[in-house]
Amino acid sequence: MENTLVKSLYRETDKYVDQKVQVSGWIRNLRDSKVFGFIELNDGSFFKSVQIVFDTELDNFKEITKLPLSSSIRVEGKFIATPTAKQPFEIKAEKIEIEGLSDSDYPLQKKRHTFEYLRTIAHLRPRTNAFSATFRVRSIAAYAIHKFFQERGFVHVHTPIITGSDTEGAGEMFRVTTHDMNNLPKGEDGQVDDSKDFFGRETNLTVSGQLPAEAYALAFRDVYTFGPTFRAENSNTTRHAAEFWMVEPEIAFAELEDVMDLTEDMLKYAMKYVLEHAPEEMEFFNKFVDKTVLERMNNVINSDFGRITYTEAIKVLQESGADFKYPVEWGIDLQTEHERYLSEQVFKRPVFVTDYPKDIKAFYMRMNDDGKTVAATDLLVPGIGELIGGSQREERMDVLVDRIKELGMKEEDYWWYLELRKYGGTKHAGFGLGFERFLMYITGMGNIRDVIPFPRTPGSAEF
């Protein structure tokens, strides 16, 4: 008999009423009495489970009543509508086959577990409601972002994980080497000789796909990357991880205004798509994780995003009379408290802050005419502060070279990046969205470790 997905039972209920069906899945809960019992069966295809009713007509009734949680079974039975009951339908079992037994020490028993504890069993946590919802939404949101760009003719570029360049110029990168740590090759100066390493030079895990994406934008016009990035920051916070995913579009013949428009369109599209395609999961988050999630998302979807320059924002903050922990003066990098004040108290909606001081932004951002600020923007949203950072890239070769030298970086490390300006360079712009930060925003999950299947953080690389 053909297997039916639980998702199909929920989406096409009328089609199955009074029909014989077969479902397979794992036992989430089991209650029994002497003559009948109930199984809550989840097959992974849908957030909700299906109720199986079984009784002593089954030859293996007693064996079924003793099954531990998470045992896998195959059930054949009649699909019955139950409109007056708690659940809309159930399956009256005529046959239950055991596919795989679970041990009685299965750690996810029928009680509440803390997220901290569930991180220690990350291989099992997707079986819980919270993480089933989280990682299905992660999948749907990722698809929505791809769909957004593909519908607009963007080319998806697979940028390298192993790189010889540091996009941010911050130096907090993971080294990639095949050197024997107990027998490092040394040069005449006593330093490690990287020419003897696998790639013949120092290489690292990428912190961003932006620079290679720029190369492809100057051939395909509109491109995007969506892949893992790595930061060797020793930050043990709820918002930092050593491995995370970035969405990075790059558009040619474009300025800062264009990239802000693209940012707003993408964010609204992805949120609408998730609300439409994961209603059960979003209802769960809004009820059990963060009761403001749906209100927050609808605020973003239905708002025209505000725009204000950094200089204007500093003035607004200084004149606000608010008691900030971090003093406000021109030149500071805005802290979360400042960002949230602007988006929550001043604009009451998402807002782009533009034209930041050059000293707090990356080398590749286009210098403004004032020589003090760059064509950069951060999107601030109510609830968390900064969500997305973008900029117009510096297309003028001489200005870019001066900036690289000013920051003490090696011009030769960026030879190919500079050549993009040499051979038909043009104005172009892009942004970066930390995918996990976006997921935290739309789910209400408060820790980045809980929106990545197997988080990598300082001192932790289990699984």
Curated annotation (Swiss-Prot):
Molecular function GO labels: asparagine-tRNA ligase activity; ATP binding; catalytic activity, acting on a protein; nucleic acid binding; transferase activity
Keyword Protein biosynthesis among UniProt keywords: yes
Catalytic activity: tRNA(Asn) + L-asparagine + ATP = L-asparaginyl-tRNA(Asn) + AMP + diphosphate + H(+)
Keywords, sorted A to Z: Aminoacyl-tRNA synthetase, ATP-binding, Cytoplasm, Ligase, Nucleotide-binding, Protein biosynthesis
The keyword Protein biosynthesis belongs to this UniProt entry's keyword annotation: yes
NCBIfam families: asnS, PRK03932.1
Quaternary assembly: Homodimer.
GO BP term, pick one: asparaginyl-tRNA aminoacylation
Gene for this chain: asnS
Subcellular location: Cytoplasm
Organism encoding this protein: Bacillus cytotoxicus (strain DSM 22905 / CIP 110041 / 391-98 / NVH 391-98)
One annotated Gene Ontology cellular component of this protein: cytoplasm
First and last residue of the signal peptide: none
EC number assigned by the record: 6.1.1.22
Domain of life according to the entry: Bacteria
Class of enzymatic activity (EC top level): ligase
Designated name of the protein: Asparagine--tRNA ligase
SUPFAM superfamilies: Class II aaRS and biotin synthetases, Nucleic acid-binding proteins
The family this protein is said to belong to: Belongs to the class-II aminoacyl-tRNA synthetase family.
